[in-house]
Amino acid sequence: IDIFTGTLGKAMGGALGGFTTARAEVIELLRQRSRPYLFSNSLPPHVVAAGIKAFDMLASAGELRTRLQENTAYFRQRMGAAGFDIKPGVHPICPVMLYDAPLAQKFAQRLLEEGIYAIGFFFPVVPQGQARIRTQISAAHTRAQLDQAIDAFTRIGRELGVI
């Protein structure tokens, strides 16, 4: 049985909501038996409309996907070349691994002081010893913005002894 679920809260730019896709029979069964479906509230119409519009834009905007893939590859390559440990993948969420919670907090604070907003993640959000700075690349980022972020990461990484 193929069931796909997703969120409208991250990649789709919404604040809440999600979706499930499957064969019609599976969806009907979920509508009848799924406790989260039965005991939850409907999404506000404007959130649903924004989600539908985002899907429409994705379906017709191959250049955005291409730019996102290019930006992600550029960021991952440059950060790796600078000496950072980036969790492998091609997705635009690029975890910069630091492995130490206080270091991740300090690093995130220093980035903010440099004008770069990125969050330090550590236990219990991620497994113990897997602290990181979570970066999320966008098709809207310019090369100059990516370079600014990479340069700040590199300066702070040297300052804090990460690289």
Could you say what each language-model-derived stretch is?
Residues I1-V90, L103:
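Active-site C-terminal subdomain of aminotransferase-like
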Residues T21-R23, P36, R110-E113, A152:
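Short, solvent-exposed amphipathic alpha-helical segments in soluble enzyme
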Residues T66-G115, V125, G129-Q130, I137-A139:
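Conserved PLP-binding catalytic core of the aspartate aminotransferase-like
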Residues E113-I116, V125-I163:
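PLP-dependent enzyme catalytic core of the Aspartate aminotransferase-like
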Residues F121-F122:
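Cytosolic Rossmann-like ligand/nucleotide-binding regulatory domains
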